[in-house]
Curated annotation (Swiss-Prot):
Source organism of the structure: Ostreococcus tauri
Protein family according to the UniProt entry: Belongs to the TRAFAC class translation factor GTPase superfamily. Classic translation factor GTPase family. LepA subfamily.
CDD domains reported in the protein's UniProt record: EF4_II, EF4_III, LepA, lepA_C
Domain tr-type G: 63-249
Residues annotated for GTP binding in this entry: 72-79, 142-146, 196-199
Record carries keyword Heme: no
Protein name: Translation factor GUF1 homolog, mitochondrial
UniProt entry tagged with the keyword Coiled coil: no
Catalytic activity entry: GTP + H2O = GDP + phosphate + H(+)
Length: 667
């Protein structure tokens, strides 16, 4: 550590510029992952009173409290607008020298690296409104925009009474814009429409505003014209929140009821909970009880996120803040739980929100089997912070002990993998993704959930009385009118059924399709972007189950099934998928002294095969002339030896080979 610090001081000049090359060089030198967070130098606030304090935050009554969220399609500027609102209210200092605060609420390294919001973040800010001169407490929740993190959006909206619906003025209404609008509408939230990025030369404010009027049914004069980059009309957003969004519907004098919104693990303090007090008052030192588990807690610390944590002794009805208890066990916190005072037995549970339903399953295994306990601890702590992930223990003959994890999509899974590596140092192998199928036995009309290919017999069920149903989704695709033909071809190739086609405006079309989830989860989004040159967007929701000809395809190496490579595919696509995976495995496996046969099979039927030729050893090199029978005898002896090696030898597939094959997208 001393050597590391010494080297950091020596390279301070390079690191002050956040040089990626310098950081990479130091990481390689010390064989460690180094992360640097850059803070802009700041200028003082206009008034010392602008900085929020615990006394000022707790003094705001319920009727002057507003809980709202910013929702939009990915990359439409939610986090950027949130930064300007925080600067405007004095929650963060304005950066000096022309620099701007960026992604203040995106605290995870993976969020800053990818430039997307993964976790919804809540922050309490104070705003003095010009209409009445009163100070208001605004609890702002910045939400993700990608469809894979819709659970974070739904969870955030359950704590809100209004939402700022943001639309990029250069892009217009997108598929996820419509999805988040209906999420907010289902919760009876007040919608504040706003067109963002109006400062850009390519912005078409009137066209986008008319789209919002037509799609969302809002009035044209309700649409705010803002710029998250420059802060244009940011104060109008705050005024609209104060004037249009109602205060929380809670009873400050009632019995305590608090909703557990989120939780994260801290190495020093244990579980740090994000709570919203709905009724009553929560004090530091209170003895509270979980309605779901019946477990008792003592409140050790309370506070507001401003976004800097500010400790307080009390949280009142309508307020959102963090809570630390005397229980460090990560399994004691269940997101969506209702908390109440200990000893009360007639507490009505809060509505909370629906648990997330995993859409994609993957097996996660440690690269080194000795690191399983390390992986177990990492998964346990990370699922506390991301309640939409499910994890069950699983064993594989090829990869050893691991977990079968459920995610909301492939991006969600990829972010989870990155967080395991960056936050806990866990090196993992992820198996091929599969969707949750359902096995139906007609003899007794029972259903069995199937999240692993090994749950299905090789080649399918022998009895016709047993069926497999696959999940369906109803997809909404918004694309330019000139690429509709190629998008229709893509949906047809993915076994889609067209439901509707309509025009959003003169240049863009809305397509609605019913598609198998397995076809969407693989690489549908990437292929959609490729065929539309990046202009098409899509979102989907569950649409039930349907009987389908789904079969298990196995991969055999020298006649031995490799369970980690088993997949569930539609019978019509099994051969194409089989040829693809055996070809990739042939390129990845090292050659041996004997021939290796790589096969893909449906039960006993081989549908694809590749062979890796053996190394040739020149056994006749020591023969200089003489009788030809001597050479033949040596060649026959070599041939017999190779037959014996093929019979008794096992092909050891390295773990990095698994990782390379399973991470490669299909052709």
């Amino acid at each position: 550590m001393r050597r590391v610090l010494k080297e950091l001081c020596r390279n301070a000049t390079a690191l002050s510029a956040s040089s990626n090359a310098s950081t990479t060089a130091l990481s390689q030198r010390f064989r460690s992952t180094l992360s640097f967070f850059r803070y802009h130098s700041s200028v003082p606030l206009k008034n010392a009173d602008d900085a929020p304090t615990a006394d000022r935050l707790t003094a705001v009554p319920l009727e002057r409290t507003r809980n709202f969220s910013i929702i939009a399609h990915v990359d439409h500027g939610k986090s950027t607008l949130a930064d300007r609102l925080l600067e405007l209210t004095g929650a963060i200092r304005r950066a000096s020298g022309g620099a701007r605060n960026e992604q203040v609420l995106d605290t995870l390294p993976v969020e800053r690296r990818r430039g997307i919001t993964v976790k919804a973040q809540a922050v309490s800010i104070l705003h003095r409104d010009e209409s009445d001169g009163e100070e208001y407490l605004l609890n702002l929740i910045d939400t993700p925009g990608h469809a894979d993190f819709s659970f974070e959006v739904a969870r955030s909206l359950s704590a809100c009474d209004g939402a700022v619906l943001l639309v990029d003025a250069t892009q217009g209404v997108e598929a996820q814009t419509i999805a988040t609008f209906y999420l907010a509408l289902d919760r009876n939230l007040v919608i504040i429409p706003a067109a963002n990025k109006v400062d850009m030369s390519s912005a078409d404010v009137e066209r986008v505003a008319n789209q919002m009027v037509r799609v969302f049914g809002v009035e044209r004069d309700e649409v705010l014209e803002v710029s998250g980059k420059t802060g244009l009309n940011a104060e109008k957003v705050l005024s609209a929140v104060v004037q249009r969004v109602p205060p929380p519907r809670g009873n400050p004098d009632g019995s305590l009821r608090a909703l557990l919104l989120d939780c994260r693990y801290d190495d020093f303090r244990g579980a740090v909970n994000l709570v919203q007090v709905v009724d009553g008052v929560l004090h530091k030192g209170d003895k509270i009880t979980s309605l779901a588990s019946g477990q008792h807690f003592e409140v050790l610390e309370l506070g507001f996120n401003t976004p800097t944590p500010i400790a307080t002794n009390v949280l009142s009805a309508g307020q959102v803040g963090y809570m630390i208890t005397n229980v460090r066990d990560v399994r004691s916190s269940k997101v969506g739980d209702t908390l109440h005072m200990r000893g009360l037995t007639t507490i009505e549970p809060l509505a909370g929100f629906r648990p997330a339903k995993p859409m994609v399953f993957q097996g996660l295994f440690p690269v080194n089997s000795d690191d399983f306990e390390k992986l177990r601890a990492a998964v346990s702590k990370l699922t506390l912070n991301d309640a939409s992930v499910t994890a069950q223990a699983e064993n594989s003959s090829a990869l050893g002990a691991g977990f079968r994890c459920g995610f909301l999509g492939l991006l969600h899974a990829d972010v989870f993998h990155q967080r395991l590596q960056e936050e806990f140092g866990a090196e993992i192998i992820a198996t091929a993704p599969t969707v949750p199928y359902r096995i139906k036995h007609q003899s007794d009309d029972t259903y069995i959930d199937c999240t692993s290919p090994l749950s299905v017999p090789s080649g399918g069920f022998p009895s016709k009385s047993t069926e497999i149903e696959e999940p369906l989704v109803e997809a909404t695709i918004i694309c330019p009118s000139n690429v509709v033909g190629t998008i229709l071809e893509l949906c047809a190739d993915r076994r889609g059924e067209q439901l509707e086609q309509s025009f959003l405006d003169d240049s863009r079309v809305i397509l609605r399709y019913k598609l198998p989830l397995g076809e969407v989860a693989a690489d549908f989004a990437d292929e959609l972007k490729s065929r539309s040159s990046g202009y098409a967007t899509f979102d989907y929701e569950e649409a039930g189950m349907r009987k389908s000809d789904i079969v298990r395809m196995d991969v055999l190496v020298n006649g031995v099934i490799v369970d980690a490579l088993a997949t569930l595919v539609h019978r019509t696509k099994a051969q194409r998928h089989g040829k693809d995976i055996v070809a990739r495995l042939k390129d990845a496996l090292p050659r041996q002294l004997y021939e290796i046969a790589i096969q893909a099979s449906l039960g006993s039927k081989i549908i694809a095969r590749e062979d890796i030729r053996a190394f040739r050893k020149q056994v006749t090199s020591k023969c200089y002339g003489g009788d030809i029978t001597r050479k033949k005898k040596l060649l026959e002896k070599q041939k017999e030896g190779k037959r014996r090696m093929r019979r008794i030898g096992n092909v050891d597939i390295p773990n990095d080979t698994f990782a390379g094959i399973l991470s490669t997208k299909r052709d």
